Amino acid sequence: MQDEHKQGNRNLPEIHYASRDWTSKHPGRHNGETHLKTRDLVIQLRGLRIRKWHSCLFPWGTRLTDRCTLQMECEPDGAGVRPVAGDVAGPEESLQLREADLKEIRHPKLHTTGRSLCSERDAQRCHLRRQSV
């Protein structure tokens, strides 16, 4: 991965994430378990000026695979969206991307904003917009 990074692979995703403190319950596939934090992800392909935000609720120590994505925001030129700096939490090896995730980034719906991917999202947080960092 380091060699790919040095060679400037245009399809190499850059992933940034941070945590924010709050507690919530999500009744979907998580069986009503309490989630202590949310993790914000920015996924960007170097060859495209596209960044996607994912706000995911899940307990610490679990992997992204098979978890609900509660909210997604996309801006085709990356304007107003930048990597989250500071307050980085969690081991990087705990973050996994499925091939389906990468295909969705490579072939995005450029003008979709605030599209929900989880039908059982937290109703109190479904319309929250991202704060500037």
Curated annotation (Swiss-Prot):
**Pfam entry (one):** Birna_VP5
Q: What does this protein do?
A: VP5 is not required for viral replication in vivo and its absence does not alter the virulence characteristics of the virus or the establishment of persistent IPNV infection.
Which family does the similarity line name? Belongs to the avibirnavirus/aquabirnavirus VP5 protein family.
Which residue stretches does the UniProt record annotate as biased composition, category Basic and acidic residues? 17-35
Q: Which domain of life is it from?
A: Viruses
Q: What is the effect of changing R130G?
A: In strain: Isolate Sp103
Its source organism is: Infectious pancreatic necrosis virus (strain Sp)
Q: What is this protein called?
A: Protein VP5
Consequence of mutating A100V?
Answer: In strain: Isolate Sp103
InterPro entries documented for this protein:
Birna_VP5
Changing L102F has the effect of: In strain: Isolate NVI-013
Q: What else is known?
A: The sequence shown is that of Isolate NVI-020. The highly pathogenic isolates NVI-013, NVI-015, NVI-023 and Sp122 have a truncated VP5 protein.
Stretches for region Disordered: 1-35
Gene symbol of the encoding locus: VP5
